[in-house]
Swiss-Prot record:
One Pfam family this sequence matches: DUF480
Region named Disordered: 168-188
Lineage: Bacteria, Pseudomonadati, Pseudomonadota, Gammaproteobacteria, Enterobacterales
Source superkingdom: Bacteria
Listed InterPro entries: DUF480, WH-like_DNA-bd_sf, WH_DNA-bd_sf
Family statement drawn from the similarity comment of this UniProt entry: Belongs to the UPF0502 family.
The protein, known as: UPF0502 protein PC1_1804
Signal peptide limits: none
Source organism per UniProt: Pectobacterium carotovorum subsp. carotovorum (strain PC1)
Length: 211
């Protein structure tokens, strides 16, 4: 995939996507603002403690990759940064508001269930229910220019599967859950059909005995 980010780059992009929506008056962002956002104690998993020099190195790399651009001059006393990651006139990646909310939350907090994503992304986009979050995840998974998310194998004792973004790595660690589920469903259908035939035969035999 052309959109590949390391851990720090994913945190920076996630923070900029988030702040563009939640605090638009503070966007574009300065180095200090981005560093503070990256090291937030809330809404971040894992919590990081990046220095300004580490963040600056990451910003420089993202500028070279054309995922960010700098804004200076014209009254700006400090260099500001804005992302070109998605929905930019300079890039090809176009995401809906719902997709942006999910991608941002996955970048900032790692693998999560649809229910967790719906709750945690509420500041960015209000999903009507978990089903809308699930359908948006499916869209991200099935996009022609993607996939951008993958569903992971359900953990033991968990009701929901988690999803993770694919902007840092591929889907090789995802279990073929859908395939397994399809096999189980097929086996169950065959078993039901067999039982129905057995019941019908027993009814026929009973009717013959009572005749």
């Amino acid at each position: 995939m052309k959109y590949q980010l390391d851990t720090r780059e994913a945190r920076v992009i996630g923070c900029m996507l988030e702040k563009q929506i939640t605090t638009p008056d503070q966007y574009p962002m300065s180095l200090n603002g981005i560093t503070t956002a990256c090291n937030q104690k809330t809404n971040r998993e894992p919590v990081m403690e990046l220095s300004e020099s580490e963040v600056q190195q990451t910003l420089d790399l993202l500028v070279k990759k054309h995922f960010l651009r700098t804004l200076s001059g014209f009254g700006n006393r400090v260099v500001k940064y804005e992302h070109r990651f998605c929905n930019s006139e300079f890039g090809d990646l176009k995401l809906s508001p719902a997709e942006v909310a999910l991608v941002t939350t996955l970048l900032l907090r790692g693998p999560q269930t649809p229910g967790e994503l719906r709750t945690r992304a509420a500041r960015l986009y209000e999903f009507s229910d978990v089903s809308e979050a699930e359908s948006t995840l499916e869209q991200l998974q099935q996009r022609d220019d993607g996939p951008f998310v993958v569903r992971l194998a359900r953990e033991a004792g968990k009701r929901e599967s988690r999803y993770r973004h694919l902007f840092s790595g591929d889907a090789s660690d995802a279990a073929p859950e859908e395939e397994g589920a399809g096999d189980n469903s097929h086996q169950l259908t065959e078993r039901v059909e067999t039982l129905e035939k057995e019941v019908a035969e027993l009814k026929r035999q009973l009717a013959a005995l009572l005749a």
